[in-house]
Structure formats: structure tokens, C-alpha cells
Amino acid sequence: MTMDTSPSHDAERGVTDVLLAEPRGFCAGVDRAIEIVERAIRKFGAPIYVRHEIVHNTFVVNDLKAKGAIFIEDLADVPPGATLVFSAHGVSRAVRDEAEARGFSVYDATCPLVTKVHVEVAKLHKEGYEFIMIGHKGHPEVEGTMGQLSEGIYLVEDVDDVAQLRVTRPDRLAVVTQTTLSTDDAAEILAAVKRRFPQVREPKQQDICYATQNRQDAVKVLAPQVDVVVVVGSPTSSNSNRLRELAERLGTPAYMVDSASDLRPEWFEGSARVGLTAGASAPELLVREVIERLRALGAVSVRKMAGVEETVRFPLPLGLGDKSMEGVA
């Protein structure tokens, strides 16, 4: 008896099933950052100025622009006396000092997990440590963390960078990482650092955030069960890009979309089962719109996979909490 290895009827006609990763989408840091901007607009009125995109998502940024947020990169573009919000990615000491010198009313939407890294850098620097930062050059979080010091912090993006690195204090050396990296890539680079600098001090807890870890773990479960993976996220979103790369590394074709309009029917030719996830800065509204588009392409079943339930919630800054907003329309 021979086994029939020809494509199934379902595979021939395209999408039939959609499997949703759990968890996916907004994390606590993104929720908090968006809420800070929205509350600032309600309390102080538009415009509210935000340094850099509050989170890396086109829909979120455009929605906040419509509500009265103005996104800037240079503090010189902020008028005197304005209210300024720092993005979730964090800022350097120089930016913080400039904002104070200009007299802005500042609300800090830096993710508390990024702030934790900044605090650790400041603490160990006082103890004479230099730092290796594992991250992506040019990412605002990396610029913010490296900008906590004027010197003594070195960026490595891959294992080759580690081999070429020269430090001043190999006996007083600590590692920090960008919070949105691939956990596998970060582990590989950290291992190379430890081989090169055996006395290096590792973070007390892994810097890569719980939400990044959970979403990557979910894709590791999702990808082998489907024919193609779709990641909802903007091109500038580091954690969304890592989800797409992870699925591809596991052998499953993967695509990243900013919205449902980016979907292409040809991606799903011969692919009955589609896995769907979203980066930590992508709202669930966009996921629902992608699901509807996949239904239009033939999907008849949409089901959630089992996954970690996230209950983390970060407090808002003083002045924007619930009590301070009483009576604000």
C-alpha cells in the first residue's frame, strides 16, 4: 500500500484554519505608555508632545495624533511650557537633562523594565563597572540605555562583535541587554561574552522582558503546527521582527503586516493552516481585522492555542493616576 502524498483538497484551496498564539499583542509597558499620553491629553488638552513614537506601531501613533499628540525627535521643536512625554523606549541622560533645562512638564512613559536596566547601569557604574550592551544599533531603547553613561559602555550586535571587542576593565565588566531581543540570539551572544570575559557579571535577572519571552515561546509552539505564520506589527517594531524571524528559523514561512490590507492571497496558496500572532505594540483590533480578512480568504475555523496568562500591570506616573484624573472629562 502506498501513501498518498499529494496536497489535500484543503491545502489546494488555501486557508481553512487560523490558530491564534497566546499571549500576543499589547504588553503592560505598551498599555501604560499609551494610557499616559491619552490621560495627559485629557488632563492638559492638546497638543501633548511625545519624544519619538510612543511605541513602534503605525496605527497607535496615528490614533494618538488624531487625539492631539505631536511626535517629535528634537526637543527644540517643543514650545516653552509644553507638556512632554518620553516614549516607552526610554531616553538618554542628555535628553532628560535638556528637557529639565527647558522647563517642560515631563511625564515619563519609559517601560519600567527598561528603567530597571537604567537603574542597574547607574548603580554598577558607581561601583566602577564598564558595560557590554547586547542590542541593535540605532534602536531608541539602545540609545537610551547607552546614553545613561558618557563612556564605558560597549554595544555588541552579534558574536563577531564580541570577538573584536576591546574593554578597559575586563575585571569589572557587566552585561545588559535590549529588552526586545530574540532570547535565543541573546543567549548565544551572552555565551560568547562569557567565553571571552569569564569574570563578566551577568544581569541579576534576564533583561529580556517577560512579554517578549512569552510571545517568542508562543511562536515556538505555534509555528510547527501551521503552514504559514502572520505577525501583526509595524516594520520598526523590534519585538515583532523577532517573532517573524523566529518562525522562519523554525522552518515556517512568515510574514509581518502593519494591517489587514498588507495581506497577500498568494502567501496562502497551498497553506491550509495559518498561525497568527502580534507584537507587543500591536493592538488586538488589528488582529481582529486580519482574522476577518483570513475568513474572506476561506478560513472557517479560528481557535486559540493554550498559553501563559499575563496579569502584569504597571502604575501610572504621579499626576496621571486615577485620583488625579477625577473630574477630568
From Swiss-Prot:
Its EC number is 1.17.7.4. [4Fe-4S] cluster binds at residues 27, 111, 209. Dimethylallyl diphosphate binds at residues 56, 89, 139, 237-239, 281. It comes from the Bacteria. It catalyses: isopentenyl diphosphate + 2 oxidized [2Fe-2S]-[ferredoxin] + H2O = (2E)-4-hydroxy-3-methylbut-2-enyl diphosphate + 2 reduced [2Fe-2S]-[ferredoxin] + 2 H(+); dimethylallyl diphosphate + 2 oxidized [2Fe-2S]-[ferredoxin] + H2O = (2E)-4-hydroxy-3-methylbut-2-enyl diphosphate + 2 reduced [2Fe-2S]-[ferredoxin] + 2 H(+). The active site is at residue 141. Pathway: Isoprenoid biosynthesis; dimethylallyl diphosphate biosynthesis; dimethylallyl diphosphate from (2E)-4-hydroxy-3-methylbutenyl diphosphate: step 1/1; Isoprenoid biosynthesis; isopentenyl diphosphate biosynthesis via DXP pathway; isopentenyl diphosphate from 1-deoxy-D-xylulose 5-phosphate: step 6/6. Binds 1 [4Fe-4S] cluster per subunit. CDD domains: lytB_ispH. It is an enzyme of class 1 (oxidoreductase). GO terms for biological process: dimethylallyl diphosphate biosynthetic process; isopentenyl diphosphate biosynthetic process, methylerythritol 4-phosphate pathway; terpenoid biosynthetic process. PANTHER family: 4-HYDROXY-3-METHYLBUT-2-ENYL DIPHOSPHATE REDUCTASE. Catalyzes the conversion of 1-hydroxy-2-methyl-2-(E)-butenyl 4-diphosphate (HMBPP) into a mixture of isopentenyl diphosphate (IPP) and dimethylallyl diphosphate (DMAPP). Acts in the terminal step of the DOXP/MEP pathway for isoprenoid precursor biosynthesis. Belongs to the IspH family. This is 4-hydroxy-3-methylbut-2-enyl diphosphate reductase. It comes from Methylibium petroleiphilum (strain ATCC BAA-1232 / LMG 22953 / PM1).
